[in-house]
Amino acid sequence: MRQAGRALPEYRAIRAEHGFHEVVTQPELTAEVTTQPVRRYGVDAAILFSDIVTPVMSMGVGVEIRAGVGPVVEQPLRTAADLDRIRTFEPDVDAPFVAEAVAMLAADLPVPLIGFAGAPFTVASYLVEGGPSKSYAHTKALMYGEEVLWHDLLARLADVTIASLRAQVAAGAEAVQVFDSWAGALSPLDYARYVLPHATRIFAELADLGVPRIHFGVGTGELLGLMAAAGPDVVGVDWRVPLDHGVARLPADVSFQGNLEPAVCLGGWEVTAPRVRDVLARAGGSPRHVFNLGHGVLPAIDPGVLREVVDLVHAEGRTDGTLADGVVVLP
């Protein structure tokens, strides 16, 4: 998940002087913000600070990231003519600042860097809706009513994702994560028909890079098996599904990531600690488990609680199939 953000005083200090667009397009700022959680929390990996629409924004599609709203598209893409705005993405020309930031981080970070990109469905939902949505009505109307056009759009966006992540690995990223934040809006039937072919191609075309490939979506408990079928090495499980239930839906050779409910941390450490141990217990000490939040860090979370989460996982997490004393599944 995105580790940096408004929960960190040091991030807020940077944002007091620089807009979000500056932070994701100026390599020095990107590198600093990406590194902040590593310094403060002692996490085992960093994830590139960026936004899922950064590539299409840098291609001139007409996307603006508005504070408190998210990505907003001036002219939504809803016709065949609109697709011409999704041209071939050239990372070294359109967004050279990303590789520059990755190279800086790869040289200086004490932990591995995870590259970051949006999945075609989620990026398409922003481009078609014109911004965040609760119903995805325009997106689904295009998907159901113009299937050929829909697959053309997602194929182009898959090309963008592939190019972006390949460039990040070339610059030094040691793993990559594909975020399908809004895939949970789809039924398994629709995901399999309208999204899975494109997700499968993404992971296939990243396979030769030899780095772990992570697939994550929000509200995707019913899609976990399909997300694994796309071919990633790791599938992220959000907080809505008990981790052991989610793992049961995955093939035995696929690793899993998750899945502490982020908002639990708002309750303080006494509430959070047993929930951390519950996640560890449900993982069963598996070497395939990557402990993580079930989504991003909420702005109101106390950084001190997150530091305690990391320390507890380091102290009591296991990878040999055993559990530390006191690590139990909550009733």
Name each region found by the language model:
Residues 1-67, 281, 303-331:
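N-terminal basic, low-complexity leaders that serve as flexible interaction/assembly modules and, when applicable
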Residues 1-4, 94-331:
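Active-site loop segments of alpha/beta catalytic cores
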